[in-house]
Amino acid sequence: GLWEKVKEKANELVSGIVEGVK
């Protein structure tokens, strides 16, 4: 569903931010 896609994108964003901080 739509919510699953939204959560998926949020996880990608968070992962990208975490990688940038390292």
Swiss-Prot record:
Stated name of the protein: Caerin-3.5
Subcellular location: Secreted
Role played: Shows significant activity against Gram-positive organisms, but is less effective against Gram-negative organisms.
Keywords: Amidation, Amphibian defense peptide, Antibiotic, Antimicrobial, Secreted
Source superkingdom: Eukaryota
Residues with PTM Lysine amide: K22
Source species of the chain: Ranoidea gracilenta (Dainty green tree frog)
Tissue expression per record: Expressed by the skin dorsal glands.
GO biological process, one term: defense response to bacterium
Family: Belongs to the frog skin active peptide (FSAP) family. Caerin subfamily.
GO cellular component: extracellular region
